[in-house]
Amino acid sequence: MAHGSEVTHASSLLSSWDAFAFKIENTQCRVGIASVKLSVSKLTPKGGNLVATYSIDVPLSKSSSDTGLIVLPIELTVDQLGTRGGTLTGVAYSNKEGATPNKIICEVRPHEDQGIRLSIITDKRTLKFKSRYTVIATATDS
């Protein structure tokens, strides 16, 4: 039988689970002489994961540009992760037909100027992006 404080704590976690999201600033890295630009939509909690769409733009090689979905399993609430930091490992699913999903590692570094590091590991290389994030309140339907 659950104690009252445990029920209140669990209820508080559930009510705050989807109350916040990560907003990541657009960023870029270099691969040889090519600039690779990354844009990520709000990383929002859905079904135990942080989920966002992404867009990679490679101006010197448009065929290398890509869009897709990022899925990062998460065990904390967004506000807890934003305060404590941590590393999440998940998958980036490309919208390109027949593309293999790529591993993505997301390091949240609140004690380093709200820094975030995103590494996308492909068959050919690892793209390493450095950016900053803000924890924002999400709109509710109530």
State what each model feature region is.
Residues 1-5:
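Sec-dependent, cleavable N-terminal signal peptides
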Residues 7-142:
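Central antiparallel beta-sheet cores of small beta-barrel/beta-sandwich binding domains
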